């Protein structure tokens, strides 16, 4: 192991010990907020400590075996030492690989919940139906992760699905798992209204944004906002409310427009719209920072229309993610079994981070 990495691990090891001791003090035990904060910090480095401790233990066994090999004359002891050296060397190599991945820079947003926006793009009615299919897919995946889904804003489409839907998913490390879902999703299938059996191609754009919590301050000048109220509407623009409870907020400097009409009160819709706006402004800044990263990692959070990231081919029961040349059966994915593709995307992210780390040395 490189000295620099070993020293970093020793510092983390010491920090872990200090935090464990601090957690047992009366001051922290009597302060629930601080207790939870420190417990969370301990949990965030516990896996590194567990692997590093195994590394240290096996390193000691290895050194002892090497000493026996040098000092002992007994053939049986020498043979046992050789076996020990081979075993420990293999273990240590595996621990080093694990630690290399565990020590990679963490995305500060990985722990956050997400706000997902899906819009119908090319394809008219079929694109809107596809938006509905994607929403169901993410909802089923969230259910499988014991995560909560809350619709923040939606516009029903006459033929089915949505022209646009914005929803929040809350759970454990949701952003880390869904951040690479952003981009253009393309569907190829025979629409229910197609009498000639021809395959149509439609698209929907997905944008995954980290939900902004109270700790992050997003400064928005009230004079930069244009706020309009109107009556909420259903599919086809039909009014479903007799009061102006729906809210549209335009952030003039960025041109971002957000709407909310699903809450019954204007106050509730304004609160939701402001939450979406803050996440969009934060995500905009995040994309600027990510331009400095690798081509693959900068895709996180971007819903640019030019980025056709994935194709859902119904006739061939095939899903293809074009960024990593990953193909699998479509049916389980559209039913919410997203983990295989999420894991493949995260593996690609780790590979690029490792390569980037080596390039910077």
Swiss-Prot record:
SUPFAM superfamilies: Release factor (SSF75620)
Keywords: Cytoplasm, Methylation, Protein biosynthesis
GO molecular function (one): translation release factor activity, codon specific
Protein family per UniProt: Belongs to the prokaryotic/mitochondrial release factor family.
Its job: Peptide chain release factor 1 directs the termination of translation in response to the peptide chain termination codons UAG and UAA.
Residue ranges crossing the lipid bilayer per the database entry: none
Post-translational modification as stated in the protein's UniProt record: Methylated by PrmC. Methylation increases the termination efficiency of RF1.
Organism of provenance: Mesomycoplasma hyopneumoniae (strain J / ATCC 25934 / NCTC 10110) (Mycoplasma hyopneumoniae)
Places the protein is found: Cytoplasm
Gene giving rise to this polypeptide: prfA
PTM sites of type N5-methylglutamine: 238
GO cellular component: cytoplasm
Protein name as it appears in the record: Peptide chain release factor 1
